[in-house]
């Protein structure tokens, strides 16, 4: 994850010292298009900013986001200001930045480079990073449990409401795992990421999938691998597909080893009904192990009292229901995507056991795929993640939390029917 520490401290300070003026006078509409073009923000981030009411609130949201967008964000912002005829704002912050840079250089000459920094700005590689380098809980991970097979009786009882999933192999699976990153980028080695990759590869094979793995790909190489995979003619002969992306990330994207972003919407687009006809009406599963922000979930104390387990019902409206079957398909359907964490938050990883999310995912799928459909298994994964807590005594990350989630356009129950062979 490229967090707030990606931006130089004097760049952050220059923005902070001019924050009120920027919040009042910044004109964002065209500027944000330039920032997208420069690969600093994503379309999803623009939508999040535009959801705020009023230009001042939108500017504040943008200024909150900007320091988290990496080492190139400040210069890109200044260029975008000039390109959108807001030179007075660019000159203002550049003048402040020059003064701050000169002041810091003078202090470092006098006292050395070990100046104390605010916590959010400290990017020293020796400082334990929340999601990447610091082991947040104790102990080695257990071996992956064997996948339990479904029975012929279970298949017969549930096949009618489920996706057809009996091909051999069940489908093709692609894993893109980035662990090592370009040295000039502020993206650290993903210690424990190799455990995630090995765990998923073994799980998918045990579930009956033909697995392809690519390690340490640039953003362009990742997109190329996804495109080639989506166009494989073998998809026509199988019943499903799996894609897993394991890397650093931000909301709406995951990082290649070159520090550039692969936009998730572009990845999903490659597998939609328009671009991947061989997978039309077939379930497509995506699993994203990457941060979606840099906020640490500190958790809250649970109030005393019985835990609520039942949800109240709701009335269903029959208004505007379509009576006739359509011959056309929506552009995107039959997909389910599991995310390691919520929007804006960081994902946790243990340096020995791998990530919390992938560990929970492999455990639940191995144990429960014999008689539980994928959406319900992801609810069980959520439950395991909810109960987990960081273990890092003496650090700010002790007892931190994480919450996974999934989104779905599935139209039937997605049972994986592991081990079931028709006619046997």
Swiss-Prot record:
Residues 296-325 are annotated as: Disordered. One of its GO terms (molecular function) is identical protein binding. Residues 1-140 form a propeptide. It comes from the Eukaryota. Pfam families: CARD, Peptidase_C14. One of its GO terms (cellular component) is nucleus. InterPro entries: CARD, CASP2_CARD, Caspase-like_dom_sf, Caspase_cys_AS, Caspase_his_AS, DEATH-like_dom_sf, Pept_C14, Pept_C14_caspase. PROSITE patterns: CARD (PS50209), CASPASE_CYS (PS01122), CASPASE_HIS (PS01121), CASPASE_P10 (PS50207), CASPASE_P20 (PS50208). The keyword Protease applies. Keywords: Apoptosis, Hydrolase, Protease, Thiol protease, Zymogen. GO terms for biological process: apoptotic process; cellular response to mechanical stimulus; DNA damage response, signal transduction by p53 class mediator; ectopic germ cell programmed cell death; extrinsic apoptotic signaling pathway in absence of ligand; intrinsic apoptotic signaling pathway in response to DNA damage; positive regulation of apoptotic signaling pathway; positive regulation of neuron apoptotic process. Residues 296-310 have a biased composition (Basic and acidic residues). Gene3D superfamilies: 3.40.50.1460, Caspase-like, Death Domain, Fas. Its EC number is 3.4.22.55. It is an enzyme of class 3 (hydrolase). Residues 7-96 form the CARD domain. It catalyses: Strict requirement for an Asp residue at P1, with 316-Asp being essential for proteolytic activity and has a preferred cleavage sequence of Val-Asp-Val-Ala-Asp-|-. The active site is at 248, 291. Involved in the activation cascade of caspases responsible for apoptosis execution. Might function by either activating some proteins required for cell death or inactivating proteins necessary for cell survival. Heterotetramer that consists of two anti-parallel arranged heterodimers, each one formed by a p18 subunit and a p12 subunit. Belongs to the peptidase C14A family. This is Caspase-2. The lineage of its organism: Eukaryota, Metazoa, Chordata, Craniata, Vertebrata. The gene is CASP2.
């Amino acid at each position: 994850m490229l967090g707030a520490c990606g931006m130089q401290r004097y760049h952050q300070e220059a923005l902070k010292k001019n924050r009120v003026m920027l919040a009042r006078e910044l004109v964002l509409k065209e500027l944000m298009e330039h920032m997208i073009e420069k690969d600093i923000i994503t379309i999803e981030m623009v939508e999040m900013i535009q959801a705020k009411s009023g230009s001042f609130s939108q500017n504040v949201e943008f200024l909150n986001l900007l320091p988290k967008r990496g080492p190139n964000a400040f210069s890109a912002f200044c260029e975008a200001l000039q390109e959108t005829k807001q030179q007075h704002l660019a000159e203002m912050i550049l003048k402040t930045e020059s003064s701050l840079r000169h002041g810091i250089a003078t202090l470092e000459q006098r006292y050395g480079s070990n100046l104390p920094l605010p916590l959010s700005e400290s990017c020293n590689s020796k400082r334990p990073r929340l999601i990447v380098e610091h082991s947040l809980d104790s102990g080695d991970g257990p071996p992956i449990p064997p996948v339990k097979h479904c029975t012929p009786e279970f298949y017969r009882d549930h096949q009618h409401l489920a996706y057809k999933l009996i091909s051999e192999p069940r489908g093709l699976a692609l894993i893109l795992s980035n662990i090592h990153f370009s040295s000039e980028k502020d993206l650290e080695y993903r210690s424990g990421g190799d455990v995630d990759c090995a765990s998923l590869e073994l799980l998918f094979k045990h579930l009956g999938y033909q697995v392809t793995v690519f390690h340490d790909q640039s953003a362009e190489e990742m997109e190329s691998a996804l495109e080639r995979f989506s166009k494989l003619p073998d998809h026509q002969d199988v019943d499903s597909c799996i894609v897993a992306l394991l890397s650093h990330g931000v909301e709406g994207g995951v990082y290649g080893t070159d520090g550039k972003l692969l936009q998730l919407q572009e990845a999903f687009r490659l597998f939609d009904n328009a671009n991947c006809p061989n997978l039309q009406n077939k379930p497509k599963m995506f699993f994203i192990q990457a941060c979606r922000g840099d906020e640490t979930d500190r958790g809250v104390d649970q109030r005393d009292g019985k835990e609520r387990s039942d949800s109240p019902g709701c009335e269903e409206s029959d208004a505007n229901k379509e009576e006739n079957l359509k011959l056309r398909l929506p552009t995107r359907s039959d997909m389910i995507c599991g995310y390691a964490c919520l929007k804006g938050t960081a994902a946790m990883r243990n340096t020995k056991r791998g990530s919390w999310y992938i560990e929970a995912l492999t455990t639940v799928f191995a144990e429960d795929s014999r008689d539980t459909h994928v959406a319900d298994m992801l609810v069980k994964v959520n439950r395991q993640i909810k109960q987990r807590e960081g273990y890092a005594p003496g650090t700010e990350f002790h007892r931190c939390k994480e919450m996974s989630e999934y989104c779905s356009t599935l139209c039937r129950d997605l049972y994986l029917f592991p081990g079931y062979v028709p006619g046997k």
